[in-house]
Amino acid sequence: MLARKSIIPEEYVLARIAAENLRKPRIRDRLPKARFIAKSGACNLAHKNIREQGRFLQDIFTTLVDLKWRHTLVIFTMSFLCSWLLFAIMWWLVAFAHGDIYAYMEKGTMEKSGLESAVCVTNVRSFTSAFLFSIEVQVTIGFGGRMMTEECPLAITVLILQNIVGLIINAVMLGCIFMKTAQAHRRAETLIFSRHAVIAVRNGKLCFMFRVGDLRKSMIISASVRIQVVKKTTTPEGEVVPIHQQDIPVDNPIESNNIFLVAPLIICHVIDKRSPLYDISATDLANQDLEVIVILEGVVETTGITTQARTSYIAEEIQWGHRFVSIVTEEEGVYSVDYSKFGNTVRVAAPRCSARELDEKPSILIQTLQKSELSHQNSLRKRNSMRRNNSMRRNNSIRRNNSSLMVPKVQFMTPEGNQCPSES
């Protein structure tokens, strides 16, 4: 929830509140780290003080495609309206200069008096009729009520010019709309990443892992994954580099970053000597000011357009000692994927030390696994003993209930005064 602002201005703070603030200084909360790449893949970067704004107009098509939809639709509508109005003024000026307006005012209606062949454009009596004729020419509606004659060469020139301008506007604006609807990042909306990344032991090595999946049946061809670590560093000369990017390799048996994304995959990076995570332990991870950026690229199978999906993981989103649960099962000869468990993780045994310490002391991993096995056996014993105790309590309660439901013996008195027990 958003923090509510104080109703009382700062210059009118009550004395008691001010005294409490002096006696109990507030602990300043740690500000959240600014992400370089948002979880949605958008770049969290603000461009300021750009002096040469005219460079955007030199590539006007890309500028129009990059605009928001509401701005694009406004420009789309205004471009046609402005062109219609501009040429409506030109048609009205042609009719006014040739005297067609006065001719129609004198004759009233067009008759068989030679007026039809004496005007530049028939039935252009006012600016409204000129505007309608401009729309008919540019959109090629062709109602037939207004038509151009051979009387004015200038009108023929205006007709040719309007057709050329109309074709240019149609090509640019319709191409812009098409490119916006077919942009590559639209396909990236169905490429999903796990919300958290994990660090666990795989094949005797500490590994950084995350999960990626595709919701569509149409595949991504030549899909590749790149991972970069972005953090603030300081050079030996004292220069502070706020955004230092470093590529980290992806563990792949074929020594390539290409993947076959037919089902959700767990992408693994082995933390070795080349990795920037080599000296980071579980305790150090919480205090690290780093961001792991993941970039998935590929070609859309249906359109052939190259698409790119991005996400990032900061230190708070990396879970140490967890692994992803399995979500792919085989059902009736078909592999089924349960996306409800896409980001679910379970806790596993993992050393809390860094990968460097693990390489220097391999016994740490053995001790961790032994402790995990012992704790697992103890939990199983406790669970079995609890089940045994619950079973014994249940049996005792059943016996008590059965004993309370036993039918008592009934005795009858004979006329002679003797007791005769009845058979139950």
UniProtKB/Swiss-Prot annotation:
Keyword Transmembrane helix tagged: yes
Location in the cell: Membrane
Cytoplasmic side: 1-69, 177-424
Membrane topology, from the record: Multi-pass membrane protein
Comp. bias intervals (Low complexity): 387-404
Motif Selectivity filter: positions: 140-145
GO MF term set: ATP binding; ATP-activated inward rectifier potassium channel activity; ATPase-coupled monoatomic cation transmembrane transporter activity; sulfonylurea receptor binding; voltage-gated monoatomic ion channel activity involved in regulation of presynaptic membrane potential; voltage-gated potassium channel activity involved in ventricular cardiac muscle cell action potential repolarization
Presence of the UniProt keyword Ion transport in the record: yes
Keywords: Ion channel, Ion transport, Membrane, Phosphoprotein, Potassium, Potassium transport, Transmembrane, Transmembrane helix, Transport, Voltage-gated channel
Entries under Pfam families matching the protein: IRK, IRK_C
A Gene Ontology biological process term: vasodilation
Region: Disordered, residue numbers: 373-409
Site annotation Role in the control of polyamine-mediated channel gating and in the blocking by intracellular magnesium: residues: 170
Catalytic activities: K(+)(in) = K(+)(out)
Intramembrane residue spans: 127-138, 139-145
A single GO cellular-component term on record: sarcolemma
Highest rank taxon of the organism: Eukaryota
Subunit structure: Interacts with ABCC9.
Family recorded in the similarity comment: Belongs to the inward rectifier-type potassium channel (TC 1.A.2.1) family. KCNJ8 subfamily.
Name of the molecule in the record: ATP-sensitive inward rectifier potassium channel 8
Organism in which the protein naturally occurs: Mus musculus
